[in-house]
Design a protein with these regions (language model features):
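Conserved AMP-binding A3 loop
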Residues: 41-43, 178-205
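Conserved pre-ATP/AMP-binding loop-to-beta segment of ANL
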Residues: 28, 162-182, 189, 215-225
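Conserved AMP-binding/adenylation subdomain of ANL enzymes
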Residues: 201-225, 233-272, 287
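AMP-binding/adenylate-forming catalytic core of the ANL superfamily
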Residues: 98, 115-117, 274, 391, ...
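Conserved AMP-binding/adenylate-forming core of the ANL superfamily
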Residues: 8, 30-74, 78-82, 99-104, ...
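Structural core segment of the AMP-binding/adenylate-forming
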Residues: 58-59, 86-158, 485-487
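Gly/Ser/Thr-rich phosphate-binding loop
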Residues: 246, 268-276, 285-353, 366, ...
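Conserved beta-loop-beta connector loops within the AMP-binding
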Residues: 364-388, 424-425, 487-491, 531
Length: 548
């Protein structure tokens, strides 16, 4: 019998354009909202994607060219998420919170020739203009109105109105590069992470299956109202704009993140599903407007850093359906989600414990905890090792950096650089970054576990724990504590809080700090993560200035 393929059978490529098919069929009248400025339906979204594609094509953008975007979260960014890769070009998302020299580096390193830039960022672009010799075409994204600056080809809306729209987008290799962005690591230059059409489609489908398949808790469905509170320049806003679009969900984009504005949008647009780093949620709950904002039933995935128990307790008390997720820039990012069966898990402590874990792997993810020899450790919730993973959407390497790529994929698994354990039920808990584990007296102390304990004190607003050099023990933990406004807590109280948990067996006695530093603020990276490298430089007398 012949096994030759049928001559007319179509080898269907997994391309980003396919994500638009279902919403246009089932919910074409659903809305896309941008702050208080823009409101239109999915039919208009499709038309605008075609217009943007036509504009870019008319400006000479072709297959494989890189188009950069510098904008806050907006409908324009969503349109670029689709239009740029759908013509075969590569979408480069500029992290606008990097230093100007780093932004110039990432634009040059990515090979960007075209940029869509918000008027707010023109002073920054002007400052690095001489460092961008290959940036040939500029399109203005303008909320405020005003004249077109020199060297700009057109304003975005005017360009769309004058463009001949692309109606039928071509098929091409599903492994073609679709996006590139840059990690915000605390060492060295930013690294370029890239993803193909196939990877982004499979990531979207797996996220839909994981979030949409939940029985009740944390479930994402077509009646939700989605608003990202993770920047669209950061890991595709965790890929959720692609998911929300594919599902035909009402979407709200807030522009620049201002707490009062975010809370007002949640109330006005009845937002039901978001995601953010712990810092952002903490900031929102601390804002005076939060007390008058109904947050009951708001589903929030926390990622980018571990979900502190104290923050989870506070969110649950407000009726927020809060739960953890886990991944990294290199994993697109989704690896695990901490959803629970609320009907079978009723004990409050167990519910809190599960919600604050990293969760269980989403479909298609092969997740392991390994020792230094790549051997598996026991899934008992105790044995720890490095988290390594395989999935069809993990980056295949760092752009133009084969040495770092080889290290990332040593042994055929992607190395996350995180330490964790998996319990009998399959839930992952990340206990620390390898580089942040405090090695003291032969023991490994989790800085995250210490932070969780200290954060429970009612007078503590924020806490970060770092390891500082010690001649006797190698390293010792130093908690850096931000007090709540109007509150007071003494050093001895923090030390005794940890000591009490040590006496009850919750943490090693080696974790009890000798001193505590009270600070006004905690240094963070451009995407809101605690910058422990910088904190060590500031507070370790061996590495930096020391001080209290």
């Amino acid at each position: 019998m012949s096994s030759a393929p049928t001559p007319d059978a179509h080898a269907y490529p997994l391309l980003i354009k396919q994500l638009l098919l279902m919403p246009l069929a089932v919910s074409p009248e659903q809305e896309i909202v941008y702050g208080d400025r823009v409101r239109f339906d999915y039919r208009t979204l499709q038309a605008r994607i075609g217009q943007l594609a036509g504009l870019l094509t008319s400006l000479g953008v072709g297959h494989g060219d890189t188009v950069a975007v510098m904008d806050w979260d907006s409908n324009r960014y969503l349109e670029a998420y689709f239009a740029v890769p759908m013509i075969g070009a590569v979408l480069m998302m500029v992290n606008v919170r990097l230093a100007p020299e780093q932004i110039a580096y990432t634009l040059n390193h990515s090979g960007a020739r075209v940029i869509l830039a918000n008027r707010e960022f023109l002073p920054l672009l002007d400052a690095i203009d001489e460092q961008l010799p290959d940036l040939r075409t500029r399109i203005l994204l303008d909320d405020a109105g005003g004249p077109l600056p020199p060297r700009f080809a057109t304003e975005y809306e005017a360009g769309l109105r004058g463009a001949t729209p692309v109606v039928r987008f071509p098929d091409f290799d599903e492994n073609a590069r679709a996006t590139v962005f840059y990690t915000t690591g605390t060492t060295g230059l930013p690294k370029g992470v890239y993803f193909s059409h196939r990877q982004l489609v499979l990531h979207s489908l797996a996220a839909m299956a994981a979030l949409g398949g939940a029985p009740r808790q944390g479930r994402l469905h077509r009646d939700d109202v989605y608003m990202p509170i993770t920047p669209m320049f950061h890991v595709h806003a965790w890929g959720l704009p692609y998911v929300a679009t594919a599902m035909g969900i009402r979407q709200v984009y807030p522009g620049r993140y201002l707490p009062a504005k975010l809370l007002a949008l949640i109330a006005r647009e009845k937002v039901t599903f978001s995601h953010c780093v712990p810092t952002i949620l903490h900031m929102l709950l601390e804002h005076p407007d939060a007390a008058q904002t109904d947050l009951e039933g708001w589903k929030v995935i926390i990622g980018g850093a571990a979900l502190p128990r104290a923050l989870a307790q506070r969110a649950l008390a407000r009726g927020i359906d809060i739960f953890g997720g886990y991944g990294m820039s290199e994993t697109c990012p989704l690896l695990t989600i901490a959803q629970i069966d609320v009907d079978s898990v009723t004990d409050a402590d167990e519910v809190l414990s599960l919600r604050t874990k990293a969760g269980i792997p989403v479909p298609l993810v092969d997740l392991r905890i390994v020792d230094p020899d790549m051997g598996d450790v026991a899934h008992d919730g105790i044995a720890t090792g490095e988290v390594v993973a395989r999935a069809p959407w993990l980056t295949q390497g760092y752009l133009h950096d084969p040495e770092a790529s080889a290290t990332l994929w040593a042994g055929g698994y992607l190395h996350t650089g995180d330490i964790g354990n998996i319990d009998e039920a399959g839930y992952l808990r990340v206990t620390d970054r390898i580089k942040d584990v405090i090695k003291t007296g032969g023991e490994w102390i989790s800085s995250l576990a210490l932070e969780d304990i200290i954060a429970l004190h009612p007078a503590v607003s924020e806490v970060a724990v770092i390891g500082i050099a010690d001649t006797k023990w190698g390293e010792r933990p130093l908690p850096l504590v931000v007090r709540k406004p109007g509150s007071h807590v003494a050093e001895a109280e923090i030390i005794e809080l940890v000591a009490a948990r040590s006496r009850s067996g919750d943490i090693s006695r080696y974790a009890i700090p000798e001193r505590v530093s009270f600070v006004d603020a905690i240094e963070r990276t451009s995407v809101g993560k605690i910058n422990k490298k910088k904190l060590r430089g500031l507070h370790d007398p061996v590495l930096g200035t020391g001080g209290r």
